[in-house]
Amino acid sequence: MAKKRRNKLRGTNGADELTGTSRKRRIYGRGGDDIISTPEGRFKVWGGEDNDTFKTLNGGKGYMKIMDFEAGDTITFCGCASTRIEQRGKNAWIVKGDDVKAVVKGVDAGDLNIDFDQAVITMSADPMA
């Protein structure tokens, strides 16, 4: 069972499904293949180890700031043609029309692949790895 502390929601070292609330605006997935989603509002989220899925809000206002996105992780979105990835400073921004859906901290927009048919965004394979 996920542990709850103050404004933080913490997962376990197994696979968890975590949803933020108006009182839980920092979400830590920890280990396991976690699914993290957020309602309206602004949230900071960490998937932790393993392959995590970050579900963006379709409709409504607010976004998640993904603090540790890495190869193997996935961002789900509406699949809408108006969704795009922009580089703003050191972060990649997932934007639908004029509404921000997610900010991916420390990631270059050019390193992300957007698949409209599958409605997912993933990290590009590193050709140097």
Label each PLM-derived region with a short phrase:
Residues M1-Y63, T83, W93-I94, G110-A129:
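Glycine- and aspartate-rich repeat motifs characteristic of hemolysin/RTX-like Ca2+-binding segments
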Residues G59-K61, E70-T83, V100, V107-G110:
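Acidic glycine-/aspartate-rich tracts in secreted/extracellular proteins
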Residues G72, G89-W93:
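A generic structural signal for beta-strand entry/edge sites
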